[in-house]
Amino acid sequence: MEFTSVNKIFEAAFKKNWLRPAISNYQGETLHFRDVARRMEKLHIMFEECGLQKRDKVAICSRNQANWAVSFLATMTYGAVPVPLLHEFKSANIHHLVNHSEAKILFVDEVIWEGLSESEMPDIQAIIQVNTFKILYAADPKI
């Protein structure tokens, strides 16, 4: 097999399977490849607006769900580095790991967000609610 970039492999897979189911929430919503691609595109726009650069880190701290995978894929295809964090970690551990990883963006469940403080993560540019992709915090008020 000829080597190609990961993005080219994903692009071919998404085009080929556009109308097929891709990922599902347990006993819930099923996302088709087209849905995943559109959500990834929206996240790429958000990443750009937040000033995310290639090789920057993006932490993801959420229960297993379809949007966790979308966040991971969007981060990877943008050229950033996904940093998965267990949702069972205590707030202090999440703060420490986000800071230690030098993450610029953090995806979180709303329940996890309730126990966190953006002031404990000074390098974070944005915190995004993983279920809805709503921006919960942005260092730049214009975002």
Please name every model-derived segment.
Residues 1-2, 104:
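A general boundary/transition motif marking the beginning of the first structured unit of a protein
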Residues 2, 11, 19-69, 73, ...:
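Conserved AMP-binding/adenylate-forming core of the ANL superfamily
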Residues 9, 50, 77-143:
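Structural core segment of the AMP-binding/adenylate-forming
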